[in-house]
Structures are given as structure tokens and as C-alpha cells.
Amino acid sequence: MRHRKSGRQLNRNSSHRQAMFRNMACSIVRHEVIKTTVAKAKELRRVVEPLITLAKSDSVANRRLAFARTRDAEVVGKLFTELGPRFQERPGGYTRILKCGLRTGDKAPMAYIELVGRPEAAEAVEDTAE
């Protein structure tokens, strides 16, 4: 029975899953939007949102915790200098999942996962309005 077991297995062993979500979390912090399957996007929220909450209060201890979870100094720098201050007033819900159809090869449901309030999104809306 799988009672009280949270999270999805995604047909991977635990180390592969941990490495995959670590890499995806680094990618979403760098690019602020990535395209992936819906199941992976929903699981990625559980990794990224606590990182951003950690970045809202800048301290050496929090930077070390973020580095332990991402293993990327560039990503930790962006988290604490850009994303933490940007989401200072928001009490959670830092990501948005937008479904975007099915993948060509295997019809897997795909989605964009993006950070809420990213600057590029506002510019794109203005361009399409003109």
C-alpha cells in the first residue's frame, strides 16, 4: 500500500529523481520559464517554491542551505539578489503552470512552468497588444 507516500516516482530511482529536480530547479531560476511534462512541473513546484522562500531572508546560513539543494553558486546568487527581493511581499505561489498541448513523439501532456511576475512576460504581452 502506498499510504502517506507523497511525491511522484516518475519511473526513476531516487538519486536520478533528485538530480533531475536539482537540474530543473537551476534551469527555472536561470531562465525563469521552462517547458516540461505536466507531472514533472507539478513536482518541480515542491522544489522551487521552498528555495524562493529561503531566499526572501538573506543570511549565510540560508545561502548554504540553498547551495546544498542546488549545488550551483550562480543560481544561489540570483536567488538571493533578484528573486528573493522580487517576491518579498508575496506569501507563496511563486510559480505558474501553463498547459501547452501534447508532445509530438508520445502524446505526453506538456506544460510551461514559469516564475510569476517575470519581466519578459510583461514585455511580450505589450508586443502582442500592438
From Swiss-Prot:
The lineage of its organism: Bacteria, Pseudomonadati, Pseudomonadota, Gammaproteobacteria, Alteromonadales. Keywords: Ribonucleoprotein, Ribosomal protein. Belongs to the bacterial ribosomal protein bL17 family. HAMAP family: Ribosomal_bL17. GO terms for biological process: translation. Part of the 50S ribosomal subunit. Contacts protein L32. This is Large ribosomal subunit protein bL17. GO terms for cellular component: cytosolic large ribosomal subunit. GO terms for molecular function: structural constituent of ribosome. The gene is rplQ. NCBIfam families: L17.
